[in-house]
């Protein structure tokens, strides 16, 4: 599904309709507003996450009803703002690892999702360079433990922040949920895509359940979901 938002008011309306997060977590964010970067909860960021969850939920129900993922990995997880809304829609997920090269971001992600960290690591942050991981057989250290895991689902909403090394280590049976954008002016955007065709060529999937774009007044975000 594609979206073409002409104004930020339209983006806000979409977020209000589709982004679901408990009031208690919003309260935590407000009370700790000096901890979390405000742009992590901008209209554009929330819209992209709402779009991801909306499409993934539909695909899970309509296309993959027999699939029950146990383990997820979120690459470039930043402060973990996707985690709670994801669990709201997919409560059956046993464990999600948020991976980011920035230790401060991982610390903030665990603070934001503390109840899930304390719940047998339903969420656990990992400080690591995603391009040093082999995603079909991940090995990393977190919380004093050496973890080896092959995640069922791999989410990367930060493709513009990294090269494609990570993509080459994904196996054919791992569901990929990928986002990128065409905005070159933001700091750290080293691998943007000019259009949907370029996005498709960079991240080819053999089985594709959706591929689309969300146009906002500032930039266009691209997303695809499927298997290599």
Where are these regions (language model features)?
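Conserved SAM/SAH-binding beta-strand->alpha-helix loop
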Residues: 101-104
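Conserved class I S-adenosyl-L-methionine
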Residues: 67-79
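C-terminal substrate-binding/active-site "lid" region of AdoMet-derived donor-dependent transferases
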Residues: 163-227
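Conserved SAM-binding loop of SAM-dependent methyltransferases across substrates and taxa
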Residues: 79-92
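A short SAM/SAH-binding and catalytic strip from SAM-dependent methyltransferases
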Residues: 143, 148-165, 182
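Short beta-strand element of Class I
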Residues: 93-99
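S-adenosyl-L-methionine
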Residues: 1-67, 107-151
């Amino acid at each position: 599904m594609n979206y073409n938002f002409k104004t930020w008011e339209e983006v806000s309306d979409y977020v209000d309709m589709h982004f679901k997060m408990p009031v208690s977590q919003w309260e935590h964010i407000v009370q700790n507003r000096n901890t979390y970067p405000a742009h992590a909860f901008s209209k554009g960021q929330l819209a992209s996450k709402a779009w991801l969850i909306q499409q993934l939920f539909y695909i899970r129900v309509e296309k993959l009803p027999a699939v029950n993922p146990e383990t997820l990995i979120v690459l470039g997880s930043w402060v973990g703002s996707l985690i709670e809304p994801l669990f709201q829609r997919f409560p059956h997920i046993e464990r999600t690892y948020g991976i980011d090269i920035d230790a401060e971001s991982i610390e903030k992600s665990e603070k934001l999702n503390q109840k899930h960290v304390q719940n047998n690591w339903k969420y656990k942050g990992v400080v690591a360079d995603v391009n040093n991981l082999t995603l079909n057989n991940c090995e990393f250290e977190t919380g004093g433990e050496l973890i080896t895991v092959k995640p069922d689902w791999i989410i990367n909403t930060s493709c513009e922040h990294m090269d494609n090394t990570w993509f080459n280590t994904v196996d054919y049976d791992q569901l990929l949920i990928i986002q990128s954008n065409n905005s070159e002016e933001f700091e750290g955007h080293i691998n943007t895509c000019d259009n949907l065709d370029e996005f498709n060529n960079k991240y080819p999937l053999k089985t594709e359940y959706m591929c689309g774009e969300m146009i906002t007044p500032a930039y266009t975000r691209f997303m695809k979901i499927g298997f290599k």
